[in-house]
Amino acid sequence: MYAIVEIAGKQFKVTKDLYIYTPKMDQEAGSSVSFDKILLLQNDQDIQVGDPTVAGAKIEGKVIEHVKGDKIIVFKRKRRKGYKTKQGHRQGYTKVLIQNILR
């Protein structure tokens, strides 16, 4: 059984007991979350496609931790002007364990 769910504008293919990294959420580590924007649900040869979402479907998960992604270097330079600047950026993510997919 798997589902395609939309979380914060991004789509994820999830199954039970799967860890996913979503854009940072406001929930604390250890709290439970539920997602109801299910776009597609597959269950034992039966596929339900939402219009735009599958009615009555829900995914339950648990927030494991908040992490930061790899560092990205932003470097700007203008030739012959002596202008250069260097910045770093690390995107915040939330690690979520998918516990259950409900119809």
Curated annotation (Swiss-Prot):
Keywords: Ribonucleoprotein, Ribosomal protein, RNA-binding, rRNA-binding. GO terms for molecular function: rRNA binding; structural constituent of ribosome. GO terms for cellular component: cytoplasm; ribonucleoprotein complex; ribosome. It comes from the Bacteria. One of its GO terms (biological process) is translation. The keyword S-adenosyl-L-methionine does not apply. Belongs to the bacterial ribosomal protein bL21 family. This is Large ribosomal subunit protein bL21.
